[in-house]
Amino acid sequence: MNELQQLLLSGKPLHITTDGFRQAMLTAFPLSGKVEKPEVQNTLGLLSTDQLAYLADHTWYQLETHEALKKQLEAIRQDNSQPAVTLTDEYANEEIPENSIAYHRVWGTVMSDAYWFFSSKQLAADLMAAEANPQITCHFLHVNSPGGDAWFLDRLDETLRACTKPIITLYEHLCCSAGYYIACHGNRVYALTANDYVGCIGTMCSFYDFQPYFEKLGIKLIEAKADKSDLKNKTFDDLRQGKPEQYVDNFLNPLNEQFLACVRSMRSGLAELGDGAPVLRGETYLTAEAVTTGLCDGTRTFAEAVAEAVVMGAEYTEAEKTKRSIYNML
């Protein structure tokens, strides 16, 4: 298994079908579960003692985020034009400096609950921990995602809306579908370059039907249902047989309406658009057109976005002080 993990994480070209790669990834890196000591060379290199200790109470994805944050902080430190700032993934640590910025990395396929990959549930927990930490004054969403699992996004939406501290979003390369579902909650949403893709607002389902292939091999599916179970799996069976209407009406459309309601409420430029607008039908845009359509607010470098987050955090702190002063006078 370690050899398979090492091969899949090596970045080397693999002569393998898409389905074969997916199956290999799910076998080598199950969506949940912990690994005691991953003795595998990967994009992080051979794990150090500190990294292994970190994995004792964190997921693999959290370790990747932790290491990515170190690199970003080092780049900021080397830029003498940028003021000192504390970006943190220690959301519950109240010993960090005042006016710290909570760094939330939304990288890769969105999963609802995962150990090796980004987890919507974990993000919700991290947001709540950062909200409760008086040392943190702003949330920084760093997004590079093509989308993914729709389940739990309604709960994550509630958590993001409930945040009282400001949120800034910086996306790079891809900010699509479920990735944008998360990213749009930023008070300000920025692209890293002029050539980042954003949008793909919509809901879909796809899968392969291997039953005809297996039947050619002489492997026939046998199925029986109780007399009073005639509707059991009927919607899915109809979908597989080329009759998707009920599946679309009962599952995809309700999920899509939630998605559309979310982006319309979070992005004023999309609020008044009709259902026929391409941006609300799944179209994807480069940055210039994304600004015009209201998907984002322009471009920022990572350092510029962090500096803006610091200002937003300071404004939040001053507003909170003013509120407390008013309450004390009443």
Identify the function of each model-found stretch.
Residues M1-L330:
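N-terminal organellar transit peptides
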